[in-house]
Amino acid sequence: METSSIVQKPALDEDTLRLARQVFQCVREGDLASLQPLFDHGFPPNLRNESGDSLLMLASYHGHHDLVRALLRAGADPEVANDRSQTPLAGAAYKGYVEVVRALLDGGAQVDGHGEDGRTALMVAAMFNRVDVMELLADRGADLRHRDASGTSGREAAQRMGAEDAANWLRERS
């Protein structure tokens, strides 16, 4: 008798799916009061949606620094990238959320961590002219000369995006 090595994930029932949708909506809205009891009772902090976005990614992307801190305390992994190879730190850098970036770094995010594309949070911040985020990342030890998987530097990426302040900032420091 031959057994298959393929293991299928069990289908989730409608109640479980409804709860997951509600949790993701609470995260987008920053509703920590509704979420904290779930985290206190062991709700999985690394839950991901169909796009690969973790709860931490969505909280970071929407600028909810208190929720980011709560998720990190509950055990969320700050290095989990989504299906587009973006880390929560890169998402917060893209949006320019300095306090979220600070919370992620305080919670263990690697300052030069990156997804498969090799882009660090500093590179993303540079591309979108988020100089205040770049300053925080540099203060925390970010590599100003890092190159992504295609060999592009943060300064080159900033120049291509027309982010002159960021490109000048990097030129002055590297």
Give the label of every model feature segment.
Residues 1-41, 50-53:
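Intrinsically disordered, low-complexity regulatory segments in ankyrin-centric signaling systems
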Residues 34, 66-67, 99-100, 132-133, ...:
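Conserved ankyrin/ankyrin-like repeat signature
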